[in-house]
């Protein structure tokens, strides 16, 4: 009589592909929250100690409703910044979807805001931004799409949030296209940079915001 040999089944490959990043994410979140705390960032995106941390400079731009949004609007708030343009066919739609996930995660909190700065302000006037907000179901109470002087927007990107390391003066030929999300705490310190096209980085961003709340 033949006996059947029992072989231990190996887990499907797709389960491993899904599980390993999740485990890494959980370990990272625990490490950040309970052990190290979030770092502070300065020029060149270099981590620094809290005592030497820089505060982001002030700003004043116009949102999708034609209202002025400035530093006082987000005083004592935790906020996320990114740079986009409404006609962007590549990374911007993905980044917007990820920011919608962030918005939904803190929908009931007035302590978290999102600011999306246009890098194409000549085309992205308030009306165009309002159309974009409507198309993507963006709640203006917590998420502002900003436009203004290209020179001022580009200067803030480079010298305020250190989003781009290239030189430029905000002129006609100057262009910034970044996939970064930037996390700023209540005191105006930069606490993190994230790949705005990454599902995993978006989850990390949400976890880090919860750490700051």
Label every model-predicted segment.
Residues 1-58:
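N-terminal targeting signals for export/organelle localization
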Residues 46-80:
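Short extracytoplasmic
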Residues 54-56, 74-78, 109-112, 124, ...:
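Extracytoplasmic
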Residues 69-99, 115:
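Short active-site neighborhood of thiol/selenol oxidoreductases, capturing the structured segment around
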Residues 96-156:
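Structural microenvironment flanking redox-active thiols in thiol-disulfide oxidoreductases
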Residues 143, 154, 158-166, 175-182:
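Structural micro-motif
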Residues 167-213:
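Thiol-/selenol-based redox modules, centered on thioredoxin-like
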């Amino acid at each position: 009589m033949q006996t059947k040999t029992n072989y231990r089944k190996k887990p499907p490959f797709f389960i491993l592909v899904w599980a390993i990043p999740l485990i890494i994410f959980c370990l990272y979140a625990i490490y950040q929250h309970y052990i190290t705390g979030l770092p502070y960032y300065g020029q060149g995106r270099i981590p620094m100690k809290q005592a030497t941390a820089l505060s982001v400079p002030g700003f004043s731009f116009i949102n999708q409703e034609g209202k002025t949004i400035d530093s006082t609007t987000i005083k004592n708030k935790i906020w996320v910044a990114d740079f986009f343009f409404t006609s962007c066919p590549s990374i911007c739609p993905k980044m917007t979807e990820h920011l919608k996930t962030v918005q939904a995660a803190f929908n009931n909190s007035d302590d978290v805001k999102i600011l999306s700065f246009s890098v194409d302000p000549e085309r992205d006037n308030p009306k165009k931004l309002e159309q974009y907000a409507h198309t993507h179901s963006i709640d203006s109470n917590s998420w502002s799409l900003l436009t203004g002087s290209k020179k001022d927007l580009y200067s803030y990107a480079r010298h305020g949030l250190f989003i781009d390391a290239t030189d430029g003066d905000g002129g006609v030929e100057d262009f910034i296209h970044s996939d970064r999300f930037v996390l700023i705490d209540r005191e105006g310190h930069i606490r993190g940079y994230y790949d705005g096209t990454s599902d995993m980085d978006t989850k990390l961003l949400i976890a880090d915001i919860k750490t700051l709340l």
